[in-house]
């Protein structure tokens, strides 16, 4: 005979409900009491309670969380999934949700960004985990973990026939997909890809993703810098020209511009994974990629996110 608590609800049944739902023990007690011990109805009760709690907590600030980065070689995706505390961000339940979310996004094989997050949340793929759709699972998790959970930034990029993605995850949390920072870098060739070129470029893209997150550039290429920014730098330098000759003045201006490019433009920044042979990103691409695969390579879409 099981030991009874309250009416006719056994401890064993409460434990079974907790294992099935992941809800707190007191919530499981209440659910079974409210449904006269009917296990299936208690599951539904907890789901509905979780949805109600999600609505209540929807205004709570979410400053913690994880960055998830993932690619299946056809699509690369990067997203920020937020919660209220660092404690919840490190729970298995939160990390499992985050991992399944980003994999589901990638498996859609579509371009996504933060403007169409709502359409992503209605996705019903991966029903083994999400059951109905992503947003319903999110709301259930809010009720379970007792914190607001939101999908923040989201970007998914579909590769072309000439491009390949590299991803990097910084400060990984229990998996290589979830961490405190992440980045995506796309490399594009002129003449297309084959197996050998893909392998070389994938390694190169992964290396550049590490560097991209580490340096956090404002621009990829020098020609992306707005002319008014360049004019402002020139004006600042001209204040100290004094009696310098035009040749000296030009030398000073070019030096100042080069310093700005080195600090802010990815192609001019230092490749950080080769300390023995200092080289810029542009030099790395030329020597380690273009000269090896005998094809032109340029940087395409890039993105980084941090918590």
UniProtKB/Swiss-Prot annotation:
This is Elongation factor Ts, mitochondrial 1. It is found in: Mitochondrion. GO terms for cellular component: mitochondrion. It comes from the Eukaryota. This protein may be expected to contain an N-terminal transit peptide but none has been predicted. Belongs to the EF-Ts family. Disulfide bonds: none annotated. GO terms for biological process: mitochondrial translational elongation. One of its GO terms (molecular function) is translation elongation factor activity. Keywords: Elongation factor, Mitochondrion, Protein biosynthesis. HAMAP family: EF_Ts (MF_00050). NCBIfam families: tsf. Coiled coil: none annotated. InterPro entries: EF-Ts_dimer_sf, Transl_elong_EFTs/EF1B, Transl_elong_EFTs/EF1B_dimer, Transl_elong_Ts_CS, UBA-like_sf. Pfam families: EF_TS. Associates with the EF-Tu.GDP complex and induces the exchange of GDP to GTP. It remains bound to the aminoacyl-tRNA.EF-Tu.GTP complex up to the GTP hydrolysis stage on the ribosome.
């Amino acid at each position: 005979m099981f030991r009874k608590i309250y009416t006719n609800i056994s401890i064993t049944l409460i434990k079974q409900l907790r294992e099935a739902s992941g809800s707190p023990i007191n919530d499981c007690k209440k659910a079974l009491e409210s449904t006269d011990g009917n296990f299936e109805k208690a599951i539904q009760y907890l789901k509905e309670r979780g949805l109600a709690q999600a609505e209540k907590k929807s205004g709570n600030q979410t400053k913690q969380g994880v960055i998830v980065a993932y690619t299946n070689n056809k699509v690369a995706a990067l997203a920020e999934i937020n919660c209220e505390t660092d404690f919840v961000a490190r729970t298995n339940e939160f990390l499992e949700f985050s991992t399944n979310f980003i994999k589901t996004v990638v498996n859609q094989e579509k371009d996504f960004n933060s403007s169409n997050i709502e359409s992503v949340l209605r996705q019903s793929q991966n029903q083994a985990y999400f059951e109905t759709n992503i947003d319903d699972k999110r709301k259930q998790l809010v009720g379970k973990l007792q914190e607001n959970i939101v999908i923040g930034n989201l970007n998914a990029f579909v590769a072309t026939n000439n491009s390949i993605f590299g991803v990097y995850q910084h400060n990984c949390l229990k998996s290589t997909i979830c961490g405190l920072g992440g980045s995506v870098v796309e490399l594009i060739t002129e003449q297309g890809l084959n197996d050998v070129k893909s392998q070389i470029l994938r390694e190169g893209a992964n290396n550049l993703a590490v560097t991209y997150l580490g340096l956090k550039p404002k621009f990829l290429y020098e020609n992306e810098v707005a002319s008014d920014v360049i004019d402002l730098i020139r004006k600042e330098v001209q204040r100290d020209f004094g009696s310098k000759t035009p040749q000296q003045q030009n030398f000073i201006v070019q030096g100042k511009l080069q310093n700005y490019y080195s600090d802010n433009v990815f192609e001019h920044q230092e490749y950080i994974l080769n300390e023995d042979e200092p080289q810029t990103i542009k030099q790395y691409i030329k020597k380690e990629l273009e000269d090896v695969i005998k094809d032109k390579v340029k940087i395409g879409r890039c993105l980084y996110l941090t918590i």
